[in-house]
Structures are given as C-alpha cells and as structure tokens.
Amino acid sequence: MADKENSTPASAARLTRSSAAAGAQAKRSAAAGVADGGAPPAKRKRVALSDLPTLSNAVVVAPRQPHHPVVIKPSSKQPEPAAEAAAPSGGGGGSPVSSASTSTASPSSGWDPQYASDIYTYLRSMEVEARRQSAADYIEAVQVDVTANMRAILVDWLVEVADEYKLVADTLYLAVSYLDRYLSAHPLRRNRLQLLGVGAMLIAAKYEEISPPHVEDFCYITDNTYTRQEVVKMESDILKLLEFEMGNPTIKTFLRRFTRSCQEDKKRSSLLLEFMGSYLAELSLLDYGCLRFLPSVVAASVVFVAKLNIDPYTNPWSKKMQKLTGYKVSELKDCILAIHDLQLRKKCSNLTAIRDKYKQHKFKCVSTLLPPVDIPASYLQDLTE
C-alpha cells in the first residue's frame, strides 16, 4: 500500500511530462504544416450583434432632370439578387421565392411542392382581404392635390432608387402597395408625395432587405427636401395604417409561381419569359388603372402578354395555365389589354426608368422587343373543353 501511495505522485509527474511532450509535438507538427503550405483549421469567432459594424452608404448625387427628384449611387452596394439578373433559382412546384424566408407573402424556395397548391390558395385568400387592398378610385374619391400622373412619376422614380440600391423586386412592389393603401385613406399634398414614397420604400426595405438603406440615405436621395424626423414620422404613420402587418402578396409573388410553372425547356426561352414578365409587371405599377385588378390577375395577364411577345403565333393560354392560375382568358381580358397598351407606349410613354432598366443586356434587352400591334381575337376567347 505504501509503495502504491508513494508511486502516485511520480506517476502523475510522468503523465504531466508526457502530456506536455505530446502538446509540444503537436505544436511543432502544426507549425511544420503551416510552413509546408497546409493551413490549420481556422476557428471562427462568433460575433455578437452589438459588435457588428454599421454599414454606411456613401453616396454621390447624380444630376436629374428638373421634374425628377435626385437619384443616388451608393458606393457600397448590396448583393444583387440572382433571380433578377440571372437564371431563376429555386422553388419546387413553381413556388414564389423571396429574400425574406419569413415573409408570408413570399415563401422561401425550400418549401415542399406538395404544399404549393395550399399556399397559393392561402395567398389568393389574403389578396382579397379589404384591409390589404387599395381603393381603385382613390385619386377621384380621396385625393384633391394628387393626380394619377404624379403617382406614376413617383413610382417611376422609386424604380430608379430600387435599381441604384440593388434592392430586391419585392421591396419595390411592397413600397408601391404601401403608398397606394396610404393614399386610399389619407388626402396628401403634392409636396409630401415624395416623402410618402421614401417612407414606404424605407419600410419595405427593412422588411425585405438584409442590409437596407438608412433613414439618412432616404433623406439624401430627396436632396434633403425632408428631414430625418419627417421621414421617421411618415414611416410611423404608414405603419399605423398597415397596423404593422407588412407582409402582403404582390404581383411579384404570383408572377414567380406562374413563370416557374410555365417555362419552356429551352433556357433562352425561359430567361426571356422571366425578364419579359418582370418588365411588364413593373410597367403595370405605373398605371393607376391597374389598381382595379387583383395582383394575381395582373400576374396572370403579364404571363399571357409575355408569352405572346415570345411566340406570337401560338395561343399564350392553355388548359395548364388556366388550371394553374384559376383564371379563364375572359376574366383576364381587360387586364391583358391594359398591359398590352402599356407596352405599346399608349400610356405612361414619358416615363422611361423601367424601359431603360430593361434595355440592359443582363435582361436580354426585353424592353426593345416590339410586341404584336393587335392581339388575335381567338386568343382572347375561353378555351373549349
């Protein structure tokens, strides 16, 4: 027993020396590995939220025409969404895709296709709720100092702002939805219309973007016409009107589902349909008259006109599209004609931001494509059983 007790400290010492030697050998091996060009596995430090740097957007004022507000060019740009300037990614079963996976209106691309039909039904039920809609006649019924042309100029400018900041498409569509819903309930002076636009864009950016522009950035893009306090106050007023429910199905929500489900096998045709659909959908935002149509109706009509542009000799509508969208051509006819007129420049022809945007090669220059002057009457008739 005594021998065992006396041997314990010695054994412990030997173990300690052995461990130290092993540790030293491990360090030498690691150092040798680095010297030989092999890097040891890096340990990443978890950064606390309070330690994250605040991203600032240094801006340069770009001169604009007198009737346009000032547009900015940020030096630190956010990542450009792949779905807008590259091949579409994502969603099984033609599901809507969004940068914000928690958005009710824009489910993420990881959902199970077996739920696609249920989600679409849910989104359709959301869009018909009165509290989520804007009035189709608010210019005549509510506004005194704001006209449809002023609204179109504002939306055209917001398209430029979203493009300069590389904001996702959902941000633009939500912002336009917010401003229309606000104008449906509150009369506004024309000198406050741009303030409403930046307030709506600020809320939409916070909801959709990973790194949204700051309040100061939105003050700056208006050439400091409004103070920070005014922008924050407008943001608060809009949120109260929305009752802080910022998620809403938009034209883009439904357009994603429809285009994913009807794309052709050829990559070129698929991209043309994607970009032409996005172009026509943004044009529809300019037209005050399109407010009388539900977002899903506009999205379905956009797909019709886009397919007509790509292949004018084939009926754009089919039983598959009718089943997918739930709409007959007769239910879309008025909206189809409205979007066709927009593309033919019969309306909003003096507003060029969207057309200039889609003249770029990354969008396959879809705004330069000439649409058919007339839509064949047979295409606007319901399909026979």
Curated annotation (Swiss-Prot):
* Keywords assigned: Cell cycle, Cell division, Cyclin
One MF term from GO for this chain?
A: cyclin-dependent protein serine/threonine kinase regulator activity
Q: Does the keyword RNA-binding apply?
A: no
> Which PROSITE patterns did the record assign?
CYCLINS (PS00292)
Pfam families per record: Cyclin_C, Cyclin_N
Spell out the residue ranges making up region: Disordered: 1-110
Q: Which GO terms describe its biological process?
A: cell division; G1/S transition of mitotic cell cycle
Q: Which domain of life is it from?
A: Eukaryota
- GO CC term, one of those recorded: cytoplasm
User: Low complexity compositional bias: what residue ranges?
Assistant: 7-41, 74-88, 96-110
Tell me which family the UniProt entry assigns to this protein. Answer: Belongs to the cyclin family. Cyclin AB subfamily.
What name does the UniProt record give this protein? Cyclin-A3-2
Q: Where does this protein come from, organism-wise?
A: Oryza sativa subsp. japonica (Rice)
Query: Lineage in the entry?
Result: Eukaryota, Viridiplantae, Streptophyta, Embryophyta, Tracheophyta
